[in-house]
Regions:
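N-terminal accessory targeting/assembly segments
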Residues: 1-87
Length: 87
């Protein structure tokens, strides 16, 4: 699913954030961490609605230092946070 910048803008995604998303990540889910629960993140944003049905997807935080409000790129193969965009 291509990066849906318009949907992300509603969540506060700016031009600087968009520049941080690498070309090879533009087909992945990019979103904002809305909630943290014991090693899991609830992410809302581009592509999350298609995967989670309600506009959010729950993924593992394994190896990622995430906080609520962070922009993240998800790894679709194993449903985890692949990368946290710079804060």
């Amino acid at each position: 699913m291509p990066l849906d910048v318009a949907a992300l803008r509603e969540l506060g995604f700016g031009d600087a954030d968009e520049r941080e998303v690498r070309v090879d990540e533009r087909e992945r889910v990019v979103g904002r961490v809305a909630r943290l629960d014991r090693g899991w993140s609830t992410v809302v944003g581009s592509g999350a609605a298609a995967r989670g049905g309600d506009g959010a997807v729950r993924v593992r935080n394994i190896g990622a230092d995430v906080a609520v409000g962070d922009w993240v790129v998800l790894d679709p193969r194993c449903e985890r946070v692949a990368r946290v965009l710079p804060r």
